[in-house]
Structure formats: C-alpha cells, structure tokens
A protein has these predicted regions:
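Short, flexible loop segments at the rims of nucleotide/cofactor-binding pockets, characterized by
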Residues: 30-33, 134-138, 187-190
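Short active-site loops of ABC-family nucleotide-binding domains
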Residues: 52, 61-62
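Walker B catalytic acidic pair
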Residues: 57-59
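Acidic, Mg2+-coordinating catalytic modules of nucleic-acid enzymes
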Residues: 144-159, 163-316
C-alpha cells in the first residue's frame, strides 16, 4: 500500500510515493513502476470535475490485477452522462485485460464495442437483441469468471457443453501440438446444450465466428441446433454450395432428409441393432424410451462397421 502526494515544484506537478509500512517517508516517483505513474494520471483525470469525456487506452498496462480491479471500480463509479454540478463523465476505454471487464448481467454487454479488424467496422450488440432475454444465456453470463471472459477477445470461440469437455480439448490440443489461443480461439463451457443456440447467436452479434462441440444427443434429439447454427446467411450459403455438389438443394434440406431417414430406421428397424445399441450408456440415460433409442442408435451407427445395409446406407 502506498500514499501518493502531488505538489507544485517550480511550476510543475511533482508526484511522490510513500509506503505505509515504512514510516510514511516519501520518495521520488522515478523509483516506482510505470504502471503506478500511469495510474496517477488516470485517477487525476477521473477526479477532475472539468473533464466531461475521457478516452483511456489500455489502462491495465504494468498494473497488478488488484490495482486493475481498483481502477475499474473508480472508472465505473464516475462513468455516466455529465450534468451540471456533477462529477460524472463519458468514458471510452480500450482494453485487452479481463480484469478491466465487469459483466454481471446480459444488459452489461450493450456497453461493449468489439473491434475485430482495422478493415472492419466496430460492432455493438443492438439493445433490442432477443438473445439477451434468454434465461439460459442470462444464467451463463451471471457465472462468467475471468477465464470465461477471455472468449470476448477471441475471434473464433469454441463452445463446449461443460468443464470435462474443456479438459479433453486442452489435452488433445497439447497432444497434437495445436495452438488454439494463438489461432484466435478460446474454449468456453456453456454448462449444457440448452443455451448453445442462443450463445451462438450472441457471439455472432459480436462479430465472432463460433464453433460448436456437443455430445451426440444434441443431434439425435432434434435438428434445433443444426437449424440455429446455419441461421446465418454467409455460413448457410457456404454449406449450401458444398451440399449442392452432391445433388442436394441445400444444407438444411440435406440435414432434414438424413434426420427423417434416421428416425424412420429407429422406428421401423430398431430390432436390427437393438442387441448392440442397448449396451450403450445412452440407452438408459433418460426416462424417455424414444430418446434413448435415438441416442444409442446414432452412436451405434457412428461406431460400428458391420451393420446391415439399411443402417450402413444412412452413413452415405
């Protein structure tokens, strides 16, 4: 802890510091780290009633996390619309530090402007975005920790269901010598697939390109996640071009045809794979018999090679 003293010295401001545990003896600012010197300048501007608008570029530079947290509190305290006889001021801050980001509810995201590239216009989430009202998304935002906030600085976040998926992805990344973070990616656990679709939409509103990694049940249960993921003109057009090369009208039509054929096989040809599928953990995971059949059947189709023609053909 330190005291800061600012005095006039030959027409200039002189900044001195004193350690509280060292007899309160002041010493020259030249002995302190540059971060503390920057902090003095920022605090002076924050406390100046004559300053109505303040632009701060990377205030976290050379500051310990605790001082960053303190500075963010001071910035938040004075931020607002300036009024007469009021100390509030408009503050625009550029940062690369999660310590300088405070998010406790989805509406807080409206204060952020995302700059992805010099050649692209900055992006701000519109205040009427329906995704902000999703209860699963609200729960996710309320639980965001410092590690989770790193995804806000990522261009291509990888969305997974839970912490165990993060562990597996990191292990695979290390084993295969993949540099996910250097490539602009960051793994974010959503804690379940219920909020996955809305989270994808939210990150696209930020100008990001999310990738989704989910368990098989997300595809066996319904096509909701598939439809929501391709609910983007650029991504759907690219997928449509790939689908058309194989004679399909589009990616969503292809997905629907495959899913309908799969559900028909589960309904009419279950006995052909029952002896294998019933051994899968998915078969007893829920109380819904049809869901159990679809989930275990999908995993069986993906894992087994020696199935009859009806089940093997769906792979093609």
């Amino acid at each position: 802890k330190r005291n800061i003293k600012i005095d006039w010295d030959a027409g200039n401001l002189k900044v001195s510091f004193a350690r509280l545990d060292n007899g309160n003896s002041y010493y020259s600012s030249g002995r302190e780290a540059s971060g503390l010197l920057h902090l003095v300048g920022i605090l002076s501007a924050l406390y100046d009633d004559e300053v109505g608008v303040l632009l701060i570029d990377e205030p976290e530079v050379s500051l310990h996390p605790q001082l960053q947290a303190f500075l963010l509190k001071e910035i938040t305290r004075v931020a607002g619309i300036p009024k007469q006889n009021d100390y509030k001021k408009i503050i625009v801050m550029a940062t690369h530090s999660t310590e300088m980001i405070k998010i406790s509810k989805t509406d807080d995201l409206l204060s952020f402007i995302f700059c992805n590239d010099l050649k692209e216009a900055p992006i701000q989430i519109p205040k009427d975005a329906g995704e902000l009202q999703n209860k699963h998304l609200k729960s996710l935002v309320a639980r965001l920790g410092q590690e989770h906030k790193l995804v806000l600085f990522s261009r291509t976040p990888l969305l997974v269901e839970g912490p165990s998926d993060v562990i597996i992805c990191n292990a695979l990344s290390d084993k295969l010598d993949l540099n996910l973070e250097a490539a602009g990616s960051q793994i974010l656990p959503i804690n379940g697939k219920e909020a996955m679709s809305e989270t994808v939409k939210l990150f696209r509103l930020m100008g990001k390109i999310p990738t989704v990694l989910v368990d098989a049940d997300a595809f066996a249960d319904s096509l909701n996640l598939v439809r929501d993921y391709f609910h983007n003109e650029q991504i759907q057009n690219a997928a449509d071009r790939l689908a058309s090369k194989n004679g399909h009208s589009g990616i969503l039509a292809l997905a629907k045809n495959i899913y309908d054929d799969f559900c028909s096989l589960v309904q009419n040809n279950w006995d052909d794979i029952a002896n294998i599928a019933q051994n899968h953990s998915y078969f007893t995971l829920s109380e819904n018999e049809l869901l159990n059949k679809k989930r275990s059947a999908l995993c069986t189709v993906l894992n087994e090679q020696n199935l009859n023609d009806d089940w093997n053909n769906i792979k093609k």
